[in-house]
């Protein structure tokens, strides 16, 4: 800065403030262009110097009780160098695709062997985590819209052996009337399936047993009726029956007195087949 000794303090103050404003406009334009960190650093130093001179002028014009001491002026931080600006800017930039959740005091974590915590949740998304085998799942309270409950949680598997362990991070407390979930919902569902299959198996066994019983009854009935039903006569049976009938009638006729037959006329011959 030029030495303004002998210059009107009022004009000097105005000039310093105008220069500071001009440097600020230049810096704003420069920040929109890439790879101009050296010029930006120089402008920052000029702006800082202008305001320092303006404060010095005010101290010389004002009452000594209200003026700023030199120590108070030096408390104002020196402008950072270009390398420091780059470093801070780089620290603020997150990796692509990564988002930092706003830090809140109402968050806590827990690790457990189950995801069930007794509250009603609805999953609204999941994301693959870098260097992690398992994705992170995002849940919100089921009553977010009907009761405006803002409670959320993030769940991620952290191990599988010897048992599955879940790492859960909660954000915010429930402000709704929580709907309790049965602790054994999935087990009961499995048990219902098992019961249904058991009943079905018992019914199949009963039908199979009934079918075997019906077959046995039909076999017994057919054997029983065969004793009462006449069977088709064989050739031998037909011959025996013919001989039996012939001898039977022959005995009947021979047992009568042939004289009794004479009154019906002369009988020349009787042949018995």
From Swiss-Prot:
Keyword annotations of the record: DNA-binding, Nucleus, Plant defense, Transcription, Transcription regulation
Record InterPro entries: WRKY_dom, WRKY_dom_sf, WRKY_plant
Superkingdom of the source species: Eukaryota
Protein name: WRKY DNA-binding transcription factor 70
A GO cellular-component term linked to this record: nucleus
Induction or repression: Induced in response to potato aphid (e.g. M.euphorbiae) infestation and root-knot nematode (e.g. M.javanica) inoculation. Up-regulated by salicylic acid (SA) and suppressed by methyl jasmonate (MeJA).
SUPFAM superfamilies referenced in this protein's UniProt entry, alphabetically: WRKY DNA-binding domain
Chain residue ranges for the region called Disordered: 76-103, 195-217
Location in the cell: Nucleus
Residue ranges flagged as DNA-binding region: 110-179
Coiled-coil regions, chain positions: none
Molecular-function GO term, any one: sequence-specific DNA binding
Gene3D superfamilies to which the protein is assigned, alphabetical: WRKY domain
Entry keyword annotation includes Nucleus: yes
Family: Belongs to the WRKY group III family.
Knocked-out gene: effects: Attenuated Mi-1-mediated resistance against potato aphid (e.g. M.euphorbiae) and root-knot nematode (e.g. M.javanica).
Function: Transcription factor involved in senescence, biotic and abiotic stress responses by modulating various phytohormones signaling pathways. Interacts specifically with the W box (5'-(T)TGAC[CT]-3'), a frequently occurring elicitor-responsive cis-acting element. Required for the resistance (R) gene Mi-1-mediated resistance to potato aphid (e.g. M.euphorbiae) and root-knot nematode (e.g. M.javanica).
One GO BP annotation of this record: defense response to nematode
Motif Nuclear localization signal, chain ranges: 88-95
Lineage summary: Eukaryota, Viridiplantae, Streptophyta, Embryophyta, Tracheophyta
Classification via Pfam families: WRKY
Keyword Lipid metabolism annotated: no
């Amino acid at each position: 800065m030029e030495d303004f000794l002998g210059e009107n303090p009022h004009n000097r103050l105005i000039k310093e403030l105008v220069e500071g404003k001009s440097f600020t406009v230049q810096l704003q334009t420069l920040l929109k262009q890439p790879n101009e960190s050296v010029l930006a650093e120089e402008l920052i130093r000029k702006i800082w110097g202008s305001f320092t001179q303006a404060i010095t002028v005010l101290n010389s014009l004002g009452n000594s009780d209200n003026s700023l001491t030199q120590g108070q002026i030096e408390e104002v931080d020196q402008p950072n160098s270009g390398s420091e600006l780059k470093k801070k800017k780089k620290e603020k930039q997150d990796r692509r695709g990564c988002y930092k959740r706003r830090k809140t005091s109402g968050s806590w974590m827990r690790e457990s062997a189950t995801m069930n915590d007794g509250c009603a949740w609805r999953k609204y998304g999941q994301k693959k985590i870098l260097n992690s085998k398992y994705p992170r799942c995002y849940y919100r309270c089921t009553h977010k819209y009907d009761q405006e409950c803002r409670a959320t949680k993030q769940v991620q598997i952290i191990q599988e052996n010897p048992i599955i362990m879940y790492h859960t991070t909660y954000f915010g407390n429930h402000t709704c009337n929580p709907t309790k979930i049965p602790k054994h919902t999935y087990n009961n569902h499995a048990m219902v399936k098992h019961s249904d299959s058991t009943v079905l198996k018992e019914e199949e066994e009963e039908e199979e047993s009934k079918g075997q019983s019906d077959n046995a009854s039909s076999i017994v009935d057919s054997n029983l009726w065969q004793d009462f039903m006449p069977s088709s006569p064989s050739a031998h049976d037909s011959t025996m029956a013919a001989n039996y009938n012939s001898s039977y009638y022959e005995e009947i006729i021979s047992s009568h007195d042939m004289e009794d037959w004479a009154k019906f006329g002369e009988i020349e011959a009787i042949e018995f087949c």
